[in-house]
Amino acid sequence: MDPNQKITILINSCDNYEDLWVPFFTLFKKYWDPKDVRILLNTESKDFSFNGLSIECIHPKNINDPYGARMLNALSHIRTPYVITLLDDFVLRNKVDQDLINRIIGWMDNDNRIAYFNCDYTKTFIDFEVNKYPGFKRIPNGNEYTLNMQAAVWRTKRLIHYWRPNVSPWEWECFTNLCAAKNKTDKFNRSVKFIL
């Protein structure tokens, strides 16, 4: 199966940041051509379109829902095993390495314990699987900010598992790592270079 049929791109935003959408999607279109990949824009109530991209806006049932509820609602619209998560201010500056994304999906297909590949650089004291995933390190559960809101390729079911309806992104980054520390089966991989 084509790796693009296994992923959805989820851009998380809010109505108040709609002024970021045109620059974000201008550079998105310039530096990435994710053929046949669903692109979802998670926001409260506004709709948005951009020439040359098929963007589906996802809105919560209640626009006053907390961020966590909005995130879970958006994730419920994803029908693929993997989701690439981005925030509206993660502006692309270079061409996205689609071959690397395809390799990541292959690695995740081959090891169900991998929860995600994060594109954030981290100083990891231990790499449990040296050179198994070139350009990435496996970081220990419970490491500070093991899970965070940086650009990442997530196993959709695991991302849903780690979210709670009443949390903000900042609370999620802090408190979810406590949950991750208890889960000894999930593997978390963080980049030593940026792909997005």
Question: What are these model-predicted stretches?
Answer:
Residues 1-63, 75-77, 81-82:
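N-terminal anchoring/stem segment of glycosyltransferases
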Residues 40-41, 83-85, 115-120, 153, ...:
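A structural signal for short, well-ordered beta-strand segments and their strand-loop junctions
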Residues 58-75, 82, 95-96, 101-104:
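A broadly used, surface-exposed interaction patch
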Residues 81-91:
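Short beta-strand-to-loop acidic/aromatic patch adjacent to the donor-nucleotide binding site
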Residues 95-125:
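Conserved donor-nucleotide/metal-binding helix-loop-beta segment in metal-dependent transferases, i.e.
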Residues 129-144:
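Short, flexible, basic/aromatic active-site loop/helix in glycosyltransferases
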Residues 146-196:
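Catalytic core and acceptor-binding pocket of nucleotide-sugar-dependent glycosyltransferases
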